[in-house]
Every structure is written in structure tokens, then in C-alpha cells.
């Protein structure tokens, strides 16, 4: 997208708008879209066009029984619906969870496989099913939006070249977030592999950033944006209809 290049935004187009097809009114003025220089400005045009019924994107989801059609990402309806309730930081597994109100949580971990140092991302876990994913790039984009530090992107190279410093950093997380003592940490050291180090390092760094936020409202806004982005409903996303 041209606007992405102008604003230097790295975003999956399906997270911006997951529409599978578009209905366009005859004579629609595409100049309204072409003239926009910012993502928020483009999103405003998309929303106005949807409300005018001149340009409508529709996302198709698997339907069971009946079907429902609903509008998504209409700005006036995007009130805060999730708040931060804490985190879960396992003593043994490579993942960590950001906990949100309503029983929702975002699991962050590497999904690249047992021997891979790639694929770190978050996945929204709801009461009934997984509800979307957010990779490290968009996670850092949202952190930057709030003026916060980002999760370093050098985890793989650090694991390969300096695993001792990686383990030392994770050990701080194990003591702070998992409440482990030194004997427990030393015992765990012999049981983990490179993939575990790669994943747990970034989990530790992300939770550290979130926990360092003292302003409760800011923290709530941040985690909700992570949740909304993963479920294609963030302020970076544009309006569409969802048929399911």
C-alpha cells in the first residue's frame, strides 16, 4: 500500500482490512482514496464510503446454520472493551500470556517449531476459540505508537552467539515473574534448547515493557490495541462488513 510506504508502517493488509471482496457503487470517486497520505485518513474515507454505501468491503467467514452480517471498525463503536488484568509467565514452557478482562488472553511464543529461531508472535485465546494473531513487527509498531521501548529483533542472533547473556536475562524474568529460586533456575538450565531461549527471551522482554508502565489507562490502551490488532479491529484497521 502506498500509505504504508509514506508512513513507514509495517502491517499485514488483512489486519488493515480482511475483506474478501468489495462492492463499488457505479461512479465512485477513487480520487478520495488516492489523495490520502496517512493511514488514519485513508481509514476515515473507507468508513465514510461504507456508511454512504458507495464502497463496501465484506469479509466471509465459515457459516454454521444461520448467517449474520455485522459492521466492524466503525470508529464511534470502538470504545475500550478490554483491560489489562496481569500476566502469566510459566516456569517451564517457552510462552507467556498477557491477561485481559473477560477471560481473554494473548499467548506470546515462538510458533516456528522445536529447532527454529523464528515465528515469535501472539495469538488471542478466547473462551471458545483462537481469535487472531499478531506478529512481532506489529507488536513493536504499537509499542512505538505509545512511545514505549520495543522488543529487540536480535533474539535469534543472540541465542546463537551469546546464549549465556540470553540465559542471564531470562533468569531475571524467572525470578521476578515466575518466583523461582536459584536452585530451580539452575535445574531448568539443563533442560532447555535454543528455540526455548529464543521464545522465552522475547516473552520476558515484552512482559517487562508492559509491567514497567505505571499509568493504568496507558497500559489498558496498549494491551487493548494488541488485542484489537490481532482480531483485525484496531484503530489501524479500516471499516468492513463481516458475514459469518
Regions found by a protein language model. Give the residues of each.
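Short, positively charged
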Residues: 1-244
Amino acid at each position: 500500500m502506498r500509505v504504508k510506504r509514506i508512513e513507514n508502517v509495517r502491517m499485514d493488509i488483512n489486519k488493515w482490512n480482511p475483506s474478501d471482496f468489495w462492492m463499488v457503487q457505479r461512479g465512485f470517486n477513487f480520487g478520495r482514496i488516492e489523495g490520502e497520505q496517512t493511514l488514519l485518513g485513508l481509514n476515515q474515507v473507507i468508513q465514510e464510503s461504507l456508511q454512504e454505501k458507495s464502497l463496501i468491503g465484506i469479509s466471509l467467514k465459515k457459516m454454521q446454520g444461520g448467517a449474520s452480517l455485522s459492521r466492524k471498525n466503525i470508529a464511534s463503536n470502538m470504545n475500550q472493551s478490554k483491560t489489562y488484568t496481569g500476566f502469566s509467565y510459566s516456569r517451564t514452557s517457552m510462552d507467556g500470556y498477557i491477561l485481559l478482562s473477560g477471560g481473554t488472553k494473548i499467548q506470546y511464543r515462538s510458533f516456528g517449531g522445536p529447532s527454529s529461531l523464528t515465528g515469535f508472535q501472539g495469538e488471542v485465546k478466547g473462551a471458545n476459540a483462537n481469535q487472531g494473531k499478531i506478529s512481532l513487527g506489529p507488536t513493536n509498531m504499537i509499542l512505538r505508537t505509545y512511545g514505549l521501548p520495543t522488543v529487540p529483533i536480535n533474539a535469534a542472533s543472540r541465542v546463537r552467539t551469546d546464549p549465556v547473556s540470553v540465559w542471564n536475562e531470562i533468569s531475571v524474568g524467572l525470578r521476578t515473574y515466575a518466583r523461582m529460586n536459584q536452585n530451580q533456575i539452575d535445574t531448568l538450565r539443563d533442560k532447555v534448547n535454543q528455540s526455548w531461549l529464543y521464545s522465552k527471551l522475547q516473552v520476558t522482554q515484552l512482559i517487562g515493557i508492559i509491567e514497567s508502565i505505571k499509568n493504568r489507562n496507558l497500559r489498558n490502551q496498549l494491551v487493548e490495541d494488541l488485542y484489537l490488532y490481532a482480531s483485525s479491529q484496531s484503530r489501524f484497521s479500516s471499516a468492513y462488513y463481516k458475514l459469518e
